[in-house]
Amino acid sequence: MVRHRDRLTSPLRAMQPPEMNDPFLSNTVSSHVRIYVDADACPVKDEIYRVAARLKVNVSVVAGNFIRIPDDPMIERIAAGSGMDAADDWIAERAGITDIVVTSDIPLASRCVKAGATVLAPNGKPFSEQSIGMTLAVRNLMTDLRSSGEITGGPRGFTPRDRSAFLSALDQAIRRIQRAQSTS
């Protein structure tokens, strides 16, 4: 059974903001901040849900696979499809200046930064216009080195310190966007 806040993508829905498509999400929050979560491998989903509930922010959990989400009308599950970059494309097409994107996918982060969104890695590291070019270049270099066999292994493990840094960065990002909206 599909819940009211689950959403399948369609061309018509893609042309409208999420609030226009879902009566349960419209007029439920005091701000227009939205968090988009690249959810398939995100280690901080529970932290996002807690911060969003406390600050009354809508969350779109975007994945190619089924992801369990809390029973909360401010949190929606987006089934972006099974294409290789379907979830990334869905997020990148919608992210804007009042949005926060949580992803460890560097190409997606680059697309969202260019769209004006605030982008955070799960370890709390912000991606910015100043840093994204170098971050993308390093990612591409590491991919080439791994494929040639010169480097084996992956990134270091996720730590409690990373989780704490993420919580702080997310809270600061939401409050910064809300302050900017209230002065506009």
Located regions from the model:
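N-terminal amphipathic/basic-hydrophobic helices that include classical n-h-c signal peptides
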Residues: 1-26
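Nuclease catalytic cores that cleave nucleic-acid phosphodiester bonds
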Residues: 21-184
